[in-house]
Amino acid sequence: SNQVLRLGVSATDSTKLGAYQLDTVDESVAPDDTHASAKTALNALFDATADYVVKGTFGTFTASVDAGADARDVASSFNLISGNSGVQATALTRAKMTVSAAATFSFTLEGKSTTPSQITATITSTTDLTAIKDAINAVSGSTGISAALTSDKSGVEITQAEGYDVIIGDVTTGSTDANLVVTAMDMDGTLDSTARTLDGDGTTGDSTAIVGTVRLSSQNAYTVTPGHANNIFGADTSELTASHNTISSVSLTT
């Protein structure tokens, strides 16, 4: 008796409590022949200005996104109107790498800096990609890309935390059997259904690019309507409705 029960909430932002969320689609460029051509193909995905109309109980506002914008730019545009709309945006670019055979892998990697970094790593077993992970982390100061091994070490998960596009190009291994396989991931770590196999023979199909993901979140219901078919929510201009992400469990301790 006479005990005081104190209840606390450790997080109050809309991405952690029950919220209305809307994510962009996972997208990557089909294998191209060079780093430069993969970058060109990436830019062509969003080659037009695309304004996004946000509607909700707060009213109607427009996030203006320029042609060629990456996920970071899109998130910034939504956050510029978040004070009025109540819809906040975060951006993240993620992908997973695996290899088909042991070899010395060499490839270019571009993220935050527009100057690609050179990655070289010797892999002696497809079940241990530590060398690729270490080589990517060694240039993270330039790319803003961090790398971590999967639990079984057979994969490397890369993250560009600011939402810059990631370009992986000009893969060479000196072998037609040793390829680099890249798969885009969403914010929650779910792999895209399409994996990009980059040929290691140094001729064609050795480059790709990963588009970042944007997550919109608000405590109130809302819709988003893209103003152009070439947009990061998919090739459509239909109105999109945010899904309600409810709180799954509450734990009380005394």
Label the model's feature ranges.
Residues 1-254:
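Polar, low-complexity tracts enriched in small residues
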